[in-house]
Amino acid sequence: MKANQTTETIHIAPPNIKNGKVWIKGTAPLVVHKFSDKAKNMIRAKQEAGSTANTKKKREAKDFTEVFNGARHISFDGWDGIPAPAFRNACIRACSLVGFKMTMAKMSIFIEADGFDATEGTPLVKIYGKEPRQLESMVRLATGVCDISVRPQWLEWGACLRFRYDGDQFTAEDVINLVHRAGLQVGVCEGRPGSTNSNGCGWGTFEISDEASVRALEKEGGAK
């Protein structure tokens, strides 16, 4: 070691990961839109067919009920859910409202899954509410062609968010307040106000609630 050279010791504290949960209730309708398995299979079949896929084929009739059910995230246990990353992303986006670095938030807050999508394995948060209605909306595709988009919509809904967070970055109260901001100012799923592609449709917003109020939605005929 050279004369007068000093050494510096770096101390890394162990992870201070904590857990919590909060019940939420929708303040606006929720619209979910899963990329259907049928659409994925059609794309795969076309790619497997190669050049022969360019031959003209008869256009298959559109089964609106099938499209509606294909747009739902249904777990292995049969209940409808919202992708858990949707809530995490909303919380991370809400950090920009309070001056907290989103890059730090990405490593500091996580939403636990209640289950997984039965066909694609997406982590899901269970929806409490009545069975969704079939929403049919006129949309314009990227090609400029008009189409009818068929999606499930819950007019009343709720959920229980189980979260993990870095206790050196947030307190439990911080996370709950962040979830509240995410619900009122960012939203989740289709037509949310915090969408990066549009100004939203006034859907997907929520507020902090309590277990009794959210479970009451289930008793009215929602997820089992």
What is the role of each PLM region?
Residues 1-224:
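RNA-interacting cores
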